[in-house]
């Protein structure tokens, strides 16, 4: 959903002032020094970082504002890395903002801090559009991960996923003064701070207001007054107390303040168990099954977190399934309501658009055209629906906007008598080249090995000897086949600590996925030859099908949807269907009627789910969960039910359907974060929507199993 941006004025000193709160964003005298003193030194960050042994240190902030606190933190963290080059932990910075600055105001505000010029440029380049939810950014070659949650803090914090060990190691309790912004400084905020706090979590804040001190103490923090910065006499700082009680309360209230759905069914809350994060070996061996867009995105996400990956796939080369089409449209599927599916699609698209552009800037090549996507209102009812979607202002204009026929014609560079929706960040991509680019990018960060002609027969867990120690590992069994020239030598057996199924349409051959209601859908795309009128097309057109601009003398026109058909042979009957759909949808465009087929194209099988959303998370042990959660239909209190059993360190990323280009990068990042124990870049509600065991839970509630 669209977030209202901040109303900003700049004073004579160039300091930004929030008109609605009548308060400055930072001190006009020395805002950077105040940030370093209040938040970094009073949280003892330099000292704690020297001794930190965990893989991640998490800072959480209650008001992002101009990003000054982040920039100061980056500067101090870089000093730490220079002085302690053996330090290996990742710094994770989570912040919230109800009224984000516009891009223009952010640039002007940060002009005052030339000492942070490089990091400020990196922030400005990644700064998100005003879209409600979590936006992930990275700095210092992935050593610092930033999650910026846009929206009301009282809505955001209950959606942060944590386990019984907590999430946050240090709080920056910032924001406008309590007297200016009393809605934020509430008991609910302090309770959430305590819920999310890890053992030893500290906090610091510039204010010394009495009700803030009392609220923090009531929530479970030890609080003390300390000397303030500059002209401010006092400030507050402290540490989480009552470790045992906090742990117990957090364990008993894992679904803290979940809203209306908590009383309706147990579907979402039980699904949340599949995002449990367990400790792994310091250097685990990772096996990814599948080498399409899901497998490549997974390898890249894991490589960014320092994992080496072995990729096993059936074919001679990667991207031979649905990811092998020469052209594919890239755009989000948005609705007139902010459903979970719409939110997932919107955030997935924004994340993917940023990632693909970053790959380009880093020198990884894949054919593409960021020409935008025009979704045509080729029927009156559709045109009306699209107009309502933009009139509601549900989605930011940077994401989608309504265009009249005249502008549509200008964007498409051809006759276009239809209004529609234009998505400027979209376009088309060569998926197979993108898959190669993702594997290449992953290989620059860690060790990535590709094993072709490896059709998985199954996995089993055994104790194996590793460096004179016994360790439980998965053994992967493959069908024997001949090695392919240029690829790694084939073996019939491999070992891994972590197994990730990113198997797409081949999921139907995986025994471990047999109990999941995956749907296989055949699709055929035409490669139609260009001609004079068609060659002018300058954007992707979507109607009941789609048509791309010219690439290598051809246009992609598609696509059919044939359920439960695993054949990939080319069919003239489906060519006729694709052409007929195109002619009918663009019946008022003469140039569109001149498009002809040439019996060239490609068919592949997509893997989808009944609710058209991916399956992302730990792989449920279906038979055990059927027994453990058999009483779900009774709708008893959550504390009654045990934690559902999952396969040990086995995960799944599949069911992307025809939206793999859009959803794969963020889904892979979510799963990689779960595996590595890092904060998850998605709200609990949305995580629950993606959980692989959601279908089983629904069946148990309905007593269908």
Swiss-Prot record:
Location of this chain's protein in the cell: Cytoplasm
Species per Swiss-Prot/TrEMBL record: Pseudoalteromonas atlantica (strain T6c / ATCC BAA-1087)
HAMAP family documented for this protein: MnmC (MF_01102)
Cofactors demanded by this protein: FAD
Any one cellular-component term (Gene Ontology): cytoplasm
Protein name: tRNA 5-methylaminomethyl-2-thiouridine biosynthesis bifunctional protein MnmC
InterPro entries from the UniProt entry: FAD-dep_OxRdtase, FAD/NAD-bd_sf, MnmC-like_methylTransf, SAM-dependent_MTases_sf, tRNA_MAMT_biosynth_bifunc_MnmC, tRNA_MNMC2, tRNA_S-uridine_synth_MnmC_C
Main location as per UniProt: cytoplasm
Highest taxon, organism lineage: Bacteria
Chain positions covered by the region annotation tRNA (mnm(5)s(2)U34)-methyltransferase: 1-241
Transmembrane segments: none
């Amino acid at each position: 959903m669209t977030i209202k941006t901040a109303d900003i004025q700049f004073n004579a000193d160039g300091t930004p002032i929030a008109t609605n709160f009548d308060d400055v964003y930072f001190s006009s005298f020395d805002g950077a020094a105040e940030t370093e003193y209040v938040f970094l030194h009073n949280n003892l960050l330099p000292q704690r970082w020297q001794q930190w042994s965990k893989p991640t240190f998490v800072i959480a902030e209650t008001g992002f504002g101009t990003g000054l606190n982040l920039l100061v933190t980056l500067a101090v963290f870089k000093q730490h890395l220079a002085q302690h080059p053996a330090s290996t932990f990742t710094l994770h910075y989570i912040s919230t903002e109800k009224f984000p600055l516009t891009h223009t105001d952010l640039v002007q505000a940060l002009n005052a801090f030339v000492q942070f010029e490089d990091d400020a440029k990196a922030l400005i380049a990644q700064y998100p559009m005003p879209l409600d939810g979590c936006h992930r950014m990275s700095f210092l070659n992935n050593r610092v991960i930033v999650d910026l949650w846009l929206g009301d803090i009282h809505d955001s914090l209950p959606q942060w996923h944590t386990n019984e060990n907590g999430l946050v190691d240090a709080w920056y309790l910032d924001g406008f003064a309590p007297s200016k912004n009393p809605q934020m400084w509430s008991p609910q905020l302090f309770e959430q701070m305590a819920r999310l706090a890890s053992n030893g979590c500290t906090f610091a804040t510039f204010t010394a207001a009495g009700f803030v001190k009392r609220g923090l103490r009531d929530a479970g923090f030890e609080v003390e007054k300390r000397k303030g910065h500059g002209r401010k006499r006092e400030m507050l700082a402290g540490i989480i107390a009552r470790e045992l009680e906090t742990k117990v309360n957090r364990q008993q209230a894992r679904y803290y303040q979940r809203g209306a759905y908590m009383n309706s069914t147990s579907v979402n809350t039980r699904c949340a168990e599949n995002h449990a994060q367990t400790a792994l070996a310091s250097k685990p061996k990772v096996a990814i099954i599948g080498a399409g867009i899901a497998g490549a995105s997974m390898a890249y996400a894991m490589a960014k977190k320092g994992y080496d990956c072995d990729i096993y796939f059936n074919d001679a080369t990667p991207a031979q399934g649905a990811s092998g089409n020469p052209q594919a449209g890239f755009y989000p599927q948005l609705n007139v309501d902010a459903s979970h599916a719409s939110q997932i699609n919107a955030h997935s698209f924004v994340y993917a658009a940023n990632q693909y552009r970053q790959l380009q800037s880093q020198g990884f090549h894949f054919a593409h055209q960021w020409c935008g996507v025009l979704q045509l209102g080729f029927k009156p009812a559709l045109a009306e629906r699209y107009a309502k979607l933009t009139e509601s202002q549900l989605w930011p204009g940077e994401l989608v906007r309504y265009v009249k026929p005249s502008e549509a014609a200008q964007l498409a560079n051809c006759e276009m008598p239809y209004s529609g929706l234009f998505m400027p960040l979209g376009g088309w991509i060569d998926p197979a080249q993108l898959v190669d680019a993702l594997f290449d990018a992953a290989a620059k960060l860690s060790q990535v090995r590709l094993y072709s002609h490896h059709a998985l027969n199954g996995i089993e867990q055994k104790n194996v000897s590793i460096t004179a120690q016994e360790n439980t590992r998965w053994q992967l069994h493959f069908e024997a086949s001949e090695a392919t020239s240029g690829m790694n030598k084939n073996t019939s057996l491999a070992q891994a600590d972590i197994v990730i199924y990113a198997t797409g349409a081949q999921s139907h051959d995986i025994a471990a996925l047999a109990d999941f209601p995956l749907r296989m859908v055949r699709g055929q795309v035409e490669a139609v030859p260009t001609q004079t009128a068609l060659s002018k097309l300058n954007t992707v057109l979507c109607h009941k099908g789609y048509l791309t601009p010219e690439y290598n003398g051809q246009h992609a026109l598609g696509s059919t949807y044939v359920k439960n058909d695993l054949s990939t042979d080319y069919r003239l009957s489906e060519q006729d269907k694709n052409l007929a759909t195109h002619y009918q949808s663009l019946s008022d465009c003469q140039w569109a009627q001149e498009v002809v087929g040439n019996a060239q194209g490609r068919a592949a099988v997509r893997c989808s789910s009944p609710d058209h959303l991916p399956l992302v998370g730990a792989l449920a042990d279906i038979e055990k969960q059927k027994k453990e959660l058999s009483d779900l239909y009774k709708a008893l209190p959550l504390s009654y039910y045990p934690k559902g059993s999952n396969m040990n360190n086995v995960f799944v990323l599949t069911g992307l359907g025809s939206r793999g280009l859009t959803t794969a990068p963020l889904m892979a990042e979510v799963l990689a974060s779960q595996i590595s124990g890092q904060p998850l870049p998605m709200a609990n509600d949305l995580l629950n929507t993606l959980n692989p065991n959601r279908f089983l839970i629904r069946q148990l509630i309905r007593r269908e199993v």
